[in-house]
């Protein structure tokens, strides 16, 4: 028996745009908790740290976090930058105005906008991060998102997502009770994992969408990251 199931779409309850705003916020709390305990935040910070090392020390950077949720990743980036005496202005983006408002306290700025039509000029953002959002889209729409990320990024794009695995499914299901996840979060979390990617799948999706060769790495907690630099083509 393979530990990597076939990729499947399933149905995440909170993908329904008519969902209750309070339930969505509760689910975002569960996502932030999962990011903390299962490595989603650490995986993104690992990549951000390497990008910061490539940029001049005195430079003020702009970071856009797409699908920011509660803004836990921008907040963690600011703490990381502060330890190295770096200054990073963070922008959290959510589709729903109510959720953007929730994220505002954790980011320098919060914006309600469509990730498929980002309201930013080309190459106007130094670092673009996108954590656990890509798997919500069918491949054609996911490619549009990746192209938008590449368009607005000046230095780097960092995508974090889930590695598809039966072990990850079992781990999430069992730990969700101890962490007191809402039942909707538990259901959607399992579906999210089954929508996740292998390293080869994610690299191919990015190359086909953007023409860039991403550095794709596994991370603890059945996570996967992909980082690429808009100025370098996949040649």
Range-by-range predicted roles:
Residues 1-17:
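N-terminal auxiliary segments of SAM/dcSAM-dependent transferases
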Residues 17, 21-47, 51-52:
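Class I SAM-dependent methyltransferase Rossmann-like catalytic core
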Residues 62-117:
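Class I SAM-dependent methyltransferase SAM/SAH-binding core
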Residues 129:
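A conserved beta-strand element that flanks and buttresses the S-adenosyl-L-methionine
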Residues 137-148:
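A short, conserved alpha-helix within the catalytic core of class I
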Residues 153-162:
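Conserved beta-strand signature within the Rossmann-like core of class I S-adenosyl-L-methionine
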Residues 162-209:
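C-terminal alpha-helical "lid/dimerization" subdomain adjacent to the S-adenosyl-L-methionine
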Residues 195, 199-235:
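Conserved Class I S-adenosyl-L-methionine
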């Amino acid at each position: 028996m393979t530990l990597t199931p076939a990729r499947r779409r399933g149905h995440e309850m909170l993908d329904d745009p008519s969902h209750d705003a309070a339930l969505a916020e509760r689910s975002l709390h569960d996502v932030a908790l999962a990011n903390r305990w299962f490595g989603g935040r650490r995986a993104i910070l690992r990549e951000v740290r390497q990008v910061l090392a490539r940029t001049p020390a005195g430079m003020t950077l702009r970071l856009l976090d797409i699908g920011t949720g509660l803004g836990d990743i921008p907040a963690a980036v600011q703490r990381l930058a502060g330890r190295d005496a770096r200054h990073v202005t963070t922008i959290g983006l959510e589709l729903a105005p109510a959720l953007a408002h929730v994220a505002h306290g954790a980011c320098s700025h919060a914006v309600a906008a469509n990730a498929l039509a980002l309201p930013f000029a080309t190459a106007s953002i130094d670092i673009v991060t996108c954590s656990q959002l890509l798997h919500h889209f069918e491949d054609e729409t996911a490619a549009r998102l990746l192209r938008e990320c590449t368009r607005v990024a000046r230095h780097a794009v960092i995508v974090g997502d889930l590695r598809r695995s039966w072990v990850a499914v079992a781990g999430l299901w069992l730990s969700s009770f101890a962490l007191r996840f809402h039942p909707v979060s538990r259901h959607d979390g399992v579906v999210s994992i089954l929508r996740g990617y292998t390293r080869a799948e994610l690299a191919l999706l990015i190359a086909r969408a953007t023409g860039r060769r991403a550095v794709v790495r596994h991370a603890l907690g059945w996570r996967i990251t992909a980082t690429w630099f808009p100025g370098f083509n996949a040649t």
